[in-house]
């Protein structure tokens, strides 16, 4: 910076020492040199901002003490990522090869967040949103040592539009994985989201963690764009059905939740058996949970296709079946209290 100031001072002195005619002729040259110095200054400023952001992210991670580990339930236990795992996850993100079928929820109650991630993977715009949010980070030795993750959320100021950069080099041992049981991009997003909340993986109410929540907020936290809810209380009108159909057939992420549906619709200890059609054409009953969130995969005049963040469903016998299923509109409006429609740009 001192060199740039000295250079500008020298340019000023040289220019002021010229006669008026030479000043007029030489002005473009001096302007070009001044612009070059300004570009260098702007570059230094951006580098300083980047270094400050990285420093803050690393400090935030270092100061984050995961709740729920010392008390013995272990829900917040974290597992470090090896360089090989980081490279594999980064390769998946860079390729854009992401699908809602990549996601299997395990011991953390963040179905609302995972359903929103699943919904983003459906469109190129949604996948780009994920790619833009996760950037691999390299250590001094040139090897990948984690990810810088942008989270559009500030739990201390929930009504304000804010974002933070979080450094992630570990994931929840009881958190989301791919079908192969290995961590993936969803694991990175989940880890960053938990790091943003004082309660980590604990309950979202009394502990201010990420277990329990609503798809609307999660969708906004992932996209930095507004989301709207279509209420199913009293059923979905023809216009509301059309709105959901149009959204499900667009690039926008769409999710649905059962938590706000009438409790009497889930008479079996918070569960209900519902007739559905699986992707292979098999008709069966699957168990729906009364406090769960799902991705809306598709919708048309005949019904709605959904995907369970668990990665599978259970039929009435307990048999595991495909995580994706199609149900009638009549059943959808009975069991799903609201539908969240997000936006990606």
Predicted features by range, described:
Residues 19, 31-33, 45-48, 142, ...:
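Generic alpha-helical secondary structure signal
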Residues 95-122, 145-299, 305-345:
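Predominantly the structural core of cysteine protease catalytic domains
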Residues 36-37, 41, 48, 56, ...:
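Generic hydrophobic, helix-prone segments enriched in Leu/Val/Ile
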Residues 1, 13-17, 142, 270-272, ...:
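Acidic, glycine-anchored loop motifs typical of Ca2+
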Residues 1-89:
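Intrinsically disordered, low-complexity charged segments of secreted bacterial virulence
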């Amino acid at each position: 910076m001192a060199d740039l100031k000295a250079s500008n001072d020298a340019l000023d002195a040289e220019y002021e020492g010229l006669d008026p005619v030479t000043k007029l002729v030489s002005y473009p040259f001096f302007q070009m040199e001044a612009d070059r110095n300004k570009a260098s200054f702007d570059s230094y400023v951006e580098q300083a901002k980047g270094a400050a952001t990285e420093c803050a992210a690393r400090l935030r991670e270092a100061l984050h003490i995961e709740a729920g580990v010392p008390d013995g339930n272990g829900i917040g236990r974290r597992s470090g990522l090896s360089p090989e795992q980081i490279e594999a996850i980064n390769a998946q993100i860079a390729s854009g090869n992401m699908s809602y079928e990549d996601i299997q929820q395990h011991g953390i109650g963040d179905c609302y967040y995972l359903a929103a991630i699943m919904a983003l993977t459906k469109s190129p715009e949604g996948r780009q949103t994920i790619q833009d949010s996760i950037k691999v980070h390299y250590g001094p030795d040139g090897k990948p040592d984690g990810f810088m993750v942008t989270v559009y959320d500030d739990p201390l100021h929930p009504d304000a539009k804010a974002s933070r950069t979080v450094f992630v080099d570990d994931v929840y041992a009881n958190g989301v994985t791919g079908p192969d049981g290995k961590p993936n991009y969803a694991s990175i997003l989940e880890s960053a989201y938990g790091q943003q909340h004082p309660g980590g993986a604990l309950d979202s109410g009394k502990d201010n963690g990420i277990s329990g929540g609503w798809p609307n907020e999660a969708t906004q936290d992932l996209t930095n764009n507004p989301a709207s809810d279509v209420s199913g209380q009293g059923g979905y009108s023809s216009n509301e059905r059309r709105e959901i159909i149009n959204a499900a057939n667009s690039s926008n992420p769409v999710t649905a939740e059962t938590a706000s549906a009438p409790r009497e619709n889930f008479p079996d200890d918070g569960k209900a058996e519902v007739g559905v059609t699986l992707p292979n054409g098999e008709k069966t009953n699957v168990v729906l949970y009364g406090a769960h969130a799902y991705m809306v995969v598709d919708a048309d005049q005949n019904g709605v296709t959904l995907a369970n963040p668990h990665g599978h469903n259970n039929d009435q016998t307990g048999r595991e079946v495909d995580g994706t299923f199609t149900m009638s509109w009549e059943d959808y409006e009975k069991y799903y209290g609201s539908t969240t429609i997000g936006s990606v740009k």
